[in-house]
Curated annotation (Swiss-Prot):
This is Glycogen synthase. It comes from Bacillus cereus (strain ATCC 10987 / NRS 248). The lineage of its organism: Bacteria, Bacillati, Bacillota, Bacilli, Bacillales. Synthesizes alpha-1,4-glucan chains using ADP-glucose. It is an enzyme of class 2 (transferase). Keywords: Glycogen biosynthesis, Glycosyltransferase, Transferase.
Amino acid sequence: MNILFAVSECVPFVKSGGLADVAGALPKELKKLGVEVRIILPNYSLIPQKLRDGCTLHKVINVPLGWRNQYCGILKGEQDGITYYLIDNEYYFKRDSLYGHYDDGERFSYFSKAVLECIPHLDFEVDVLHSHDWHTAMVNFLLREKYQDNPLYEHIKTVYTIHNLQFQGVFPPEVMYDLLELGDEYFHSEQLEFYGNVNFMKGGIIASDQITAVSPTYKEEIQYEFFGEKLDGLLRKYNGKLSGIVNGIDTSVYNPETDSYITAQYDADSLYEKSKNKRALQRYFGLPEKEDTPIISMVTRLTKQKGLDLVRTVFREIMEEDVQCIILGSGDSEYEKFFEWMAYEYPEKVKVYIGFNEELAHQVYAGSDLFLMPSLFEPCGLGQLIALAYGTIPIVRETGGLNDTVQSYDEETGEGNGFSFTNFNAHDMLHTVRRAIEFYHDKPVWEQLVKQAMTEDYSWGKSALAYKKLYKSLME
């Protein structure tokens, strides 16, 4: 079974979000199950030179784009036993950021065409083409509409994964007409047209044989208007081919027993070592080294989606508790400034690191007691899974993947691995934070809760099995 992942980012090459983690980890897990996965992505100038040097030129072809043919170099390399193809074109991919350019519609139209034009030259017979998010959605659409009659392509099945419905790849109609050479028959509401523009994600949803969302709850949510980003009707129409498969984490990267970034490695049976990470974290940030004061942390993009309006509303009330708070992330300036002001107002309790630091993030996960993630919506979420693996108990809102992976602690049965609240309401969140703090001070209960969190399986194992089953069903 041969699978080709078409992605716009992938660890360890480039990363801007969770898509890169999925593209980096899932193929390795599928390989353990006997599924051959190869990955194709753009050869961005942002890829570290060391990784680019590990690739060789496999082939040079021309890619038809509108009225011209564009150069396409196919570079081939290997990382961790997985074969990668990098699509080389400096005009489109020698940029200072992955996305956000005036010509993104053209850049990813080119990449979509390049993926399809490369397939006959890859020394690899593709059984299933698996595209991800808006950037490669048109690969599946173009395959069905323009390439399926070609004997080289007619057997290929398609899967499309929605990582975040909010970002859809909406561009002017000229992109469809001039670059992809699709006619008027595609510019209507049953096809690519979307409020006067063209929507790439819509193409992926319509044309793919199977669609997955990155958690079962998110799969249900996106069929409702509140979460549906104006595509809920389309998703309801195609819900027969829509499924939800929760993401995992790469346990070779996120594992407190082997993590080289943290001060002291530990497992569920050596939690006294976790407390060394807490002291090291307090020391790093200049916080008082209080063992019995819980550290509440957030490692997050500072955006509205992450529920920061709730945090902002009741932050001072949280500060009335005996807690310390650490925020690591960057994003909208209004949230950055708010947390910087709180750090100024509460110098003995609040510390903020604006930006991202991989090593520090690992230390925050290992050294904190509670991890706050009150998202407005969360397709899957990575932070809560990492926190659980490190025995840092998550406080989450019951949405998307948070609802699927965090079971609220039940004092009657002793079951659960975290704390959760249902409504997007600041005082519901505050009540849940206070409840978590209360149990933190009940040491036997807390130790049991931490052990329950750490002994569950958050790896890609179960997810990879589900994807293998999905691929297999397409080939029967």
